Amino acid sequence: PIYHTHGLFTATNTVLLSGGSLLFRRKFDVNEVVSLFPLATSLMGVPTFYTRLLNHEGLTRDSVKHMRLFISGSAPLLAETHREFEEKTGHAILERFGMTETSMNTSNPYRGERRAGTVGLPLPGIEVRVTDPASGGLLPQGDIGMIEVRGPNVFAGYWRNPEKTAAEFRPDGFFVTGDLGSFDAQGYLTISGRGKDLVISGDFVEVLWFQGF
């Protein structure tokens, strides 16, 4: 939706600034979307778009031959969905991570490896770290913790709510996103879920694990 940062700033504004055109639809209708592929070059959507497209018999390599790019955001995309879509269409979905308070933070590369199950690498000028949700201490690579970001993309604070602003920022300027995740050895970030969804039971259980059932 265009009232979200992904739909407004990343999708709509960047296309218009580059002189492109947009095909706005009232809602996501999988039959209509498949029929519009010959008129488009890219699709920006959420993970449910791609799971529904995968179940459509009209999604083939031939039907997307005019397409240049498929982008997913706003929620984590299952690695299985990413792999199945690439097998069926030849296109590796470009997944990234952003939020209203920061706009885009990380992205899989346009040119380079788009790693399934990850939201890519920190964008230039943006610092991303993973910390212990309880202590705020920096966690080693591979450990799941709270994702924090710092950079010129981060907002100044919540409107007329200094208490919430103070609660969401670290003293060194990092913004606490509320999302849980981890880095792999190559620096790709994986989102595991929301901090508020965390169950304290001696270990972290990834929300995506449950969503796979």
For the regions a language model picked out, list residue spans one by one.
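Conserved AMP-binding
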Residues: 1-4, 75
